[in-house]
A protein has these predicted regions:
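Low-acidity, Ser/Thr- and Arg-rich intrinsically disordered low-complexity segments
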Residues: 1-39
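Short acidic loop-to-helix transition motifs that present clustered carboxylates
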Residues: 40-44
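A conserved structural/catalytic subdomain of Rossmann-like adenosyl-cofactor enzymes
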Residues: 45-273
Length: 273
């Protein structure tokens, strides 16, 4: 079962068509608006979503938009948004989309949500929601993407991968900032870039300057910060200077300077004579 969350319907027909073309047995595919009615399609029949859960959820919601939040009594008691005990801030609905996706995720499913990076480290209600997600072992991976990747924004976004049946109590952090090629004013993920990211995600192990597997306990001790840069060390690309070699070069310069001074003194003394 595949679920796509998108306000506009431009992506959904393409997704549905792709499954018609590649699969003789069509899975359940759904398109849902976070504020609108929810429907799913199986073959060519439309029915209203009830308690249907989905194996794959992909979402690229708008970043940090406003929503009613706890001003709306219905939302406060809505099981999609309230399990953490708080709702996403009214000025930043990012976690509302994430909690919405989690509510439709099957037990053995995977959800991938493109996120604004601020939700990974900001405090307040967002920190409490991160705590809920981490303490319940729902966060599987955080992937830092390159900047200028999406049309209309230069922000370096992230992907949050959620699972309800993880095999460990850790989160994989992947720094994929370098996994892109420059195309005019934007960056683009090539097939090779995508393969590299997927392989790192699948291998689920530490790679210097690329990925780090961190326990939920350590993340909790770090104020539930999910920023990739907190855990994946940046490679130091500055030129490394050998101090011993530098000191020898300085000594040689001083010696040559001393010799030159003596030669200059000699020349001056000869002129005076």
């Amino acid at each position: 079962s595949v679920l796509s969350f998108k306000k506009a319907d431009s992506t959904f027909p393409k997704l549905a068509l792709s499954f018609f073309l590649i699969s003789t047995s069509l899975p359940t595919i759904a398109n849902s608006s976070i504020m609108g009615r929810k429907y799913f399609v199986k073959s060519n029949l439309f029915d209203k979503l009830d308690n249907k859960k989905f194996d794959i959820i992909v979402s690229n919601p708008p970043y940090s938009i406003k929503w009613a939040g706890d001003d709306n009594a219905v939302l406060i008691n809505d099981p999609r948004y309230s399990p953490a005990g708080v709702l996403a801030p009214k000025s930043k609905a990012d976690f509302a989309f994430i909690m919405h996706s989690l509510s439709w995720l099957a037990t053995n499913g995977t959800a991938s949500i493109v996120c604004f990076p601020g939700i990974l480290y900001r405090g307040g209600a967002e920190q409490k929601i991160r705590k809920y997600l981490i303490d319940n072992n729902f966060v599987d991976c955080i992937i830092q993407l390159p900047d200028n990747l999406f049309f209309g924004t230069s922000i370096a976004t992230c992907i949050m991968v959620l699972k309800k049946s993880k095999k460990d109590n850790s989160i994989l952090f992947i720094d994929a900032i370098k996994e892109c090629v420059k195309v005019t004013n934007n960056n683009k993920l090539t097939d090779e870039n995508i393969e590299n990211i997927v392989k790192t995600f699948t291998d689920r192990k530490d790679i210097d300057y690329v990925s780090k597997l961190v326990s939920n306990k350590e993340i909790g001790e770090n104020d539930y910060n999910l920023s990739v840069s907190t855990y994946v060390e940046k490679e130091d690309t500055r030129e490394k200077i050998d101090i011993d070699v530098l000191n020898k070069e300085i000594d040689e310069i001083v010696k040559r300077e001393s010799v030159l001074r003596e030669e200059i003194k000699k020349i001056i003394s000869e002129i005076e004579v």
